[in-house]
Amino acid sequence: MVIFDSVVKKKLEFIPLENDFVRIYVCGPTVYDDAHLGHAKSAISFDLLRRTLVALGFKVKFVKNFTDIDDKILKKMEDSGKSLKEITEFYISRYLDDMNALNVLRADIEPRATECIDEIIEFVEELLDNGAAYKIQGDGIYFDTSKDSDYLSLSGKKDSDENIARVASNAQKKDEKDFALWKFDEKYYKAKFGCGRPGWHTECVVMIKKYLTDNKQKYLIDIHAGGMDLLFPHHENEAAQCRCAEHKNLAKYWMHNGFVQVNNEKMSKSLGNSFFIKDALKIVPGEALRFYLMSSHYRANFNYSVNDLFSSKKRLDKIYRLKKRLQGAKKGISDEKFKAEILDALSDDLNTSLALSIVDSMVNSANERLDKNPKDKMKKGEILANLDFVKETLGILYTDENLYFQFGVSETKKAEISDLIAQRDAAKKEKNFALADEIREKLALQNITLMDTPNGTVWEISNETDIK
């Protein structure tokens, strides 16, 4: 497998630190609001990385954190009158619901920064003791970037770059690039260097050290991943702290996903142009949103478009149509050539666009074969096995094929439809075909199509519409 490393800015062969065992850390959300499509893209991108590595035979330990103490969360507390725990637990729960809808696998460990305060304090003390940090009275503990000779080597930035100014300014800092490890505040955690709360960059490096580190290795972990906006200053500052505290590099490989944009501008909460995952899930199934976000390369920036989202759904619809044709079939042996082509595409820095086109071709070929011989049990078994492989590697096709085509219909409406189908079944049994046809036509006027199968009558929405 080859992956694009953000430091050297080229594809590198992936060679794990320890045989077939891979340690991955992904920066998770700051939980003060609902997750937007940018969060979805990042989560899906590195879920695909994990799935691909597992499909290739690697064992993966996957950690994704929650930043649950931060200036934005504290502002939310002030505005809402709610406690830190009330806010963070609420948004963590909603985030996990979104991830479940997108078929993003749960991380092996999902640490919260507030669960690691003792380790963070110990880490800051270590940096103070070795001279890599200093105290500003009444403000906090700062990292001295001059103590890291490799500072800015990760992002490739220069001191003259304008966005160095993204680091909070303070006239008492030794250098404008220096950043807070600990912010003094009597309301929070006790430490011998002063009560306060941790800085964002320190939280992540400590969680990596606590949950993933193997001190026998040259690096703490194999892969550190996150959005491109985290490369500087967040990941740069994590790496600097690690070099000064651990005297080794943080990660062997660094991977970053591109932005979801609106009108060619990065989607973000701070810019006020976010399109929340929950908004998208009102108009398409989660798998369709996942398919859409996988249709472009994970490193590419792309503009969000409702039309493109629906186009992706139509591609997914076609796969589910094939799945419906296989109802009652028994899974057989998958096509090894098909599996190899998918893995080859994903092994090339997660080329999902190519992988999905290979799936499209398989679906077309399968439909042609079934059109010619709809009773070919062996072929049906092979196709079913192929689709199962697609499910495991690409994270789609988790939904029952009948329920998939009932998306957006309320439970109340589903109950009404079921009642009408029962009435129609009774009418057919009594040979009252006129009433049976009347019920079918009544449902057709509501854009509901009935299909009589050996296992009973099933229904689906016949076109894109809002049926409540």
Curated annotation (Swiss-Prot):
InterPro entries in the cross-refs: Cys-tRNA-ligase, Cys-tRNA-synt_Ia_DALR, Cys-tRNA/MSH_ligase, Rossmann-like_a/b/a_fold, tRNA-synt_1_cat_dom, tRNAsynth_Ia_anticodon-bd
Keywords: Aminoacyl-tRNA synthetase, ATP-binding, Cytoplasm, Ligase, Metal-binding, Nucleotide-binding, Protein biosynthesis, Zinc
Single Gene Ontology BP annotation: cysteinyl-tRNA aminoacylation
Positions annotated to bind Zn(2+): 27, 204, 234, 238
Record GO terms (molecular function): ATP binding; cysteine-tRNA ligase activity; zinc ion binding
Residues involved in ATP binding: 269
EC number: 6.1.1.16
GO cellular component: cytosol
Positions occupied by motif 'HIGH' region: 29-39
Motif ('KMSKS' region): 266-270
Named cofactor requirement(s): Zn(2+)
Homology family: Belongs to the class-I aminoacyl-tRNA synthetase family.
Protein known as: Cysteine--tRNA ligase
Annotated source species: Campylobacter hominis (strain ATCC BAA-381 / DSM 21671 / CCUG 45161 / LMG 19568 / NCTC 13146 / CH001A)
